[in-house]
Amino acid sequence: MPPQLSDGLNYSAKIVRGSLDSLPQAVRSFVESSAKLCRPDQVHICDGSEEENRQLLSHMEEEGVIKRLKKYDNCWLALTDPRDVARIESKTVIITREQRDTVPIPKNGLSQLGRWMSEEDFEKAFNIRFPGCMKGRTMYVIPFSMGPLGSPLSKIGIELTDSPYVVTSMRIMTRMGTSVLEALGDGEFVKCLHSVGCPLPLKKPLVNNWACNPELTLIAHLPDRREIISFGSGYGGNSLLGKKCFALRMASRLAKEEGWLAEHMLILGITNPKGQKKYFAAAFPSACGKTNLAMMNPTLPGWKVECVGDDIAWMKFDQQGNLRAINPENGFFGVAPGTSVRTNPNAIKTIQKNTIFTNVAETSDGGVYWEGIDQPLAARVKLISWKGKEWDPKDGEPCAHPNSRFCTPASQCPIIDPDWESPEGVPIEGIIFGGRRPVGVPLVYEALSWQHGVFVGAAMRSEATAAAEYKGKVIMHDPFAMGPFFGYNFGQYLAHWLSMAQRPAAKLPKIFHVNWFRKDKAGRFLWPGFGENSRVLEWMFNRVVGEGGASVTPIGYIPDEDALDLRGLGDVDVKELFHISKEFWEEEVEEIQKYLEEQVNVDLPPEIKNQVLALKQRISQM
């Protein structure tokens, strides 16, 4: 008879893999108490092995949860319930005793900088959802490390889930398995509890064999207890709890307490033709080309870009004052639509094997397809849309969901940086902010100081995105591209960033802002983007090494006329790309001031107020 987990009364669960005795005591207690609450039939302690992964994938294939894509090596397609396709900001909450620990109290209306829930309300919500929620299912115990095992910058989590899709995705996105338990020992870990919220027998049939409970979806973070609790959604951002939940919301709070930074940033290395290398971190809201920039093929001869990470950076000053960064993830969870050989050839090479696709279209010959893939379909090949039906362009809706994803191992990226898993991290010398701004904002400018740079991050705005549930083309505020991911009060977050300047011996990176998306009057992009963005990286690189020419403007330093290498580019209206309109910037600074005063209110650091006033003053003198 297999070993059992029992409450000594009327409940017991079979241990179908691994042994409770192999778990550190605190992990074992977490597993036992959660099992007694959620009542799974079986408990499976994940070891992260290839054999376990194969078994889970075949099990899901038999259940009709995923489908094998025969055109590629070990690639799979999951189609979700159409009600479970994205992060849901309205159902994502942070629980602290005081509301102001989570969000600044706005002058009026709701905070746009996070969602607070009281401990009492959470208690009620939890008790409605979790008791018995895993009946008839298997509880998987996933030990995972955010960051390379053994790095002083890494953190460990234990996720309990009833979704094998989560297990196989977490194996790609994190370092996962027995080695993590060995590294953990009796150390601290973040407790992550996830359920799709569909105990068996089902009350109503599943859509696409995808288990979820949209009516009761809730993603909750309890930073004081180091716990993340997610219910009702199987979608990546809500169920792979190492990703945004741990690596940003929980980690930003840990970072504040421990004196480091957890940021929504890619990390890339740039090497010039002389062999000099510099690392940059960059924060863009989703749909602004973060993954494309992280994996860029530069068009400039002799320049090389290598990828450390495409989404999240954990950064800490070392003893020598260098800002060291690791990518806490182990894979890429990228938006598929728009990814093509033209826009991101390295991503296309990365996803040819060992990849789980979600909500993309399928070709009748066992391949994948999406809007912007730029590949003609072979004769007689049909398309099955993400809704599982044969697709016709005349349908008037996309074949792939706009937020469809690939989940793929970072190690497969052809330009992965040789130091991407270096335990001490890579030294960051430039930080780039950016957004999708069709008018008014120049291609690139450099902040006048660290304090001004922090203000530039706070003032980030961008056209809205598919990764969240908003629709339509509105310019949204998204400070530091962290709008949906702050783990604590944004006013305190700004103070934390500003405090970096007070660190003894800190070598502060230069801060830049880019906008690849400025348009001309006819609505055409002024800048070709993609690999040509290497020309802008070259200028930033030169600024970091003290070489690139720049002129001061009211909003920051912009490249001198000859400082940007435009050879071979053809017709680019540089004058329009860098035009700074007094009228536009007067409106922009008013909008930023209004937003910060209303949203951050009394928690706005005085230094940021000073930066607003100084910018106003400089613009008025144009």
Curated annotation (Swiss-Prot):
Record EC number: 4.1.1.32, 2.7.11.-
Pfam family, one: PEPCK_N
Entry keywords, A to Z: Acetylation, Cytoplasm, Decarboxylase, Endoplasmic reticulum, Gluconeogenesis, GTP-binding, Kinase, Lyase, Manganese, Metal-binding, Nucleotide-binding, Phosphoprotein, Transferase, Ubl conjugation
PTM annotation (N6-acetyllysine): residues: K70, K71, K91, K473, K521, K594
More info: In eukaryotes there are two isozymes: a cytoplasmic one and a mitochondrial one.
One of the GO BP terms on file: gluconeogenesis
Family, per entry: Belongs to the phosphoenolpyruvate carboxykinase [GTP] family.
Induction summary: Regulated by insulin, cAMP and dexamethasone.
Active site per database record: C288
Processing and modification events after translation: Acetylated. Lysine acetylation by p300/EP300 is increased on high glucose conditions. Lysine acetylation promotes ubiquitination by UBR5. Acetylation is enhanced in the presence of BAG6. Deacetylated by SIRT2. Deacetylation of Lys-91 is carried out by SIRT1 and depends on PCK1 phosphorylation levels.
The protein, known as: Phosphoenolpyruvate carboxykinase, cytosolic [GTP]
Matching CDD domains: PEPCK_GTP
Catalytic activity from the UniProt record: oxaloacetate + GTP = phosphoenolpyruvate + GDP + CO2; L-seryl-[protein] + GTP = O-phospho-L-seryl-[protein] + GDP + H(+)
Listed PANTHER family: PHOSPHOENOLPYRUVATE CARBOXYKINASE, PHOSPHOENOLPYRUVATE CARBOXYKINASE, CYTOSOLIC [GTP]
Positions of substrate binding: R87, Y235, G236, G237, S286, N403, S404, R405
Cofactor note: Binds 1 Mn(2+) ion per subunit.
Classification via Gene3D superfamilies: 3.90.228.20, Phosphoenolpyruvate Carboxykinase, domain 1, Phosphoenolpyruvate Carboxykinase, domain 2
Annotated compartments: Cytoplasm, Cytosol; Endoplasmic reticulum
Assembly behavior: Monomer.
Stated role: Cytosolic phosphoenolpyruvate carboxykinase that catalyzes the reversible decarboxylation and phosphorylation of oxaloacetate (OAA) and acts as the rate-limiting enzyme in gluconeogenesis. Regulates cataplerosis and anaplerosis, the processes that control the levels of metabolic intermediates in the citric acid cycle. At low glucose levels, it catalyzes the cataplerotic conversion of oxaloacetate to phosphoenolpyruvate (PEP), the rate-limiting step in the metabolic pathway that produces glucose from lactate and other precursors derived from the citric acid cycle.
Residues the record lists as binding Mn(2+): K244, H264, D311
